[in-house]
């Protein structure tokens, strides 16, 4: 299961429309369909009922949705934290103190 699969799944599940999900993610609609199909094949179950142009979540799709959201949220939180650590300034701090002060306060 790839993060892209979950991203596309959540987008379609929230919009109940493959074309709108593709538009929101700035990808072609066939790419969305292909990735959803790959996810369904991997899981061995349909996540969406497709009736004409209407799309609804199956029971399995409804069960997966909160987990997919949680996974994507956790990944974004991890990325944010790592980016923040990359922007922290690093270096050496030198302190100067008279010998009487440093003997008491500095190791």
What role is predicted for each listed range?
Residues 15, 24, 37-46, 72, ...:
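Residue cluster at the C-terminal edge of the helix-turn-helix DNA-binding motif
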Residues 65, 82:
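Conserved short C-terminal alpha-helix that flanks the catalytic cleft of nucleotide-sugar-dependent
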Residues 29-30, 34, 73, 77-80, ...:
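N-terminal winged-helix
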Residues 12-28, 52:
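Short helix-boundary/capping micro-motifs
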Residues 40-57, 62:
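A short LG(V/I)-centered, amphipathic sequence patch enriched
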Residues 9, 21-22, 58-61:
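Hydrophobic two-helix hairpin corresponding to the core of helix-turn-helix DNA-binding domains
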Residues 1-15, 29, 33, 62, ...:
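Short alpha-helical elements of helix-turn-helix
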